[in-house]
Amino acid sequence: MLIRRLALHQLRRFSAVDLSPQPGLNLLTGDNGAGKTSVLEALHLMAYGRSFRGRVRDGLVRQGQEALEIFVEWDEQRADHPPHRRKAGLRHSGQDWKGRLDGEDVAQLGNLCAALAVVTFEPGSHALVSGGGEPRRRFLDWGLFHVEPDFLSLWRRYSRALKQRNALLKQGGPSRMLDTWDHELAEAGEPLTSRRQHYLERLQQRTVALAASLAPQLGIQGLELSPGWRRHELPLADALLLARERDRQAGYTSVGPHRADWSVDFHSIPGRDALSRGQAKLTALACLLAQAEDYAEQRGEWPVIALDDLASELDRTHQARVLERLLNGPAQIFITATETPAALLDLTHIARFHVEHAQIVAVP
């Protein structure tokens, strides 16, 4: 996956900018607050439907404007398809949105996000390891969404059934109607959990190997899924039935894949609560790069790699290890920094851009 053009309109500080990235490494430098991160935000928004710094309506649209617009043009280079050029556009006001993909309107934002794959490491990425379960569930589902074409329909089926069951619980609905939605939840939730389990097992080997290469002191030994109910003891249908009275009192469904989580097992660190912020960042980075490598193997092309403020997030040793691994592969990489990171000072084959006064200028 190779981005050829990125155009931003009315996004944070930018009125209108047009960027032509190059294959390999693209370095964006500039002072703090110049807008470097906004470029990566735009890519992330196109790939995930949201910014990694909050909701669109929370400051992503330039002050005084109605909506932001993003246009991306890229070459898709999958092993099972001939190379071809793709185009996507998004107009987002924070409330309403309109998207186009390859000249056609898209009805669901997920269809737009399915086209462009971006793996992002940014200052908040440590939450993947040290935060609550929601970002870890999103991590699993994003990977499955991109490598298993029917996963999205399965996920939507489960989400729809969960919404209906929760509504019945709040309304005090009859047991026969709850029976119907319990059955639907189990029919979608069991295979959804099996997909997550198999995917995490696949990532485990890569994550352990990556961590041993990038940060051996972490001693990462494996990844473990908590499915959201005692799956080793009983099927989801039984778990839902057993929890029904408790769920009636609470007004929501307390068991199932929506309560799932996963954890990293360490050799000598007792758990995520004992991690320093730096250890959490390195662990998250190992997981994210493992996901990118798995995507590349399954799809036959690399996702775009976006590394925000790398020099502030990692020390020189770990910067060098990460960049050495990435630069030995075919991925297109975007890095932001206030100045050229030490690990890149001796490299010549880099596309350099400077961000200043709401403009992006290519540096010869």
Swiss-Prot record:
Role, per record: The RecF protein is involved in DNA metabolism; it is required for DNA replication and normal SOS inducibility. RecF binds preferentially to single-stranded, linear DNA. It also seems to bind ATP.
GO CC terms of this entry: cytoplasm
Family from the record: Belongs to the RecF family.
Gene3D superfamilies referenced in this protein's UniProt entry, alphabetically: P-loop containing nucleotide triphosphate hydrolases, RecF/RecN/SMC, N-terminal domain
Binding of ATP, residues: G30, D31, N32, G33, A34, G35, K36, T37
Protein localization: Cytoplasm
Gene that encodes it: recF
Main location (coarse class): cytoplasm
InterPro entries per UniProt: DNA-binding_RecF, DNA-binding_RecF_CS, P-loop_NTPase, RecF/RecN/SMC_N, RecF_2
Annotated protein name in UniProt: DNA replication and repair protein RecF
SUPFAM superfamilies linked: P-loop containing nucleoside triphosphate hydrolases
Source organism of this protein record: Stenotrophomonas maltophilia (strain K279a)
Pfam family, one: SMC_N
The entry's keywords: ATP-binding, Cytoplasm, DNA damage, DNA repair, DNA replication, DNA-binding, Nucleotide-binding, SOS response
S-S pairs: none
HAMAP family documented for this protein: RecF (MF_00365)
GO molecular-function term, one example from the UniProt record: single-stranded DNA binding
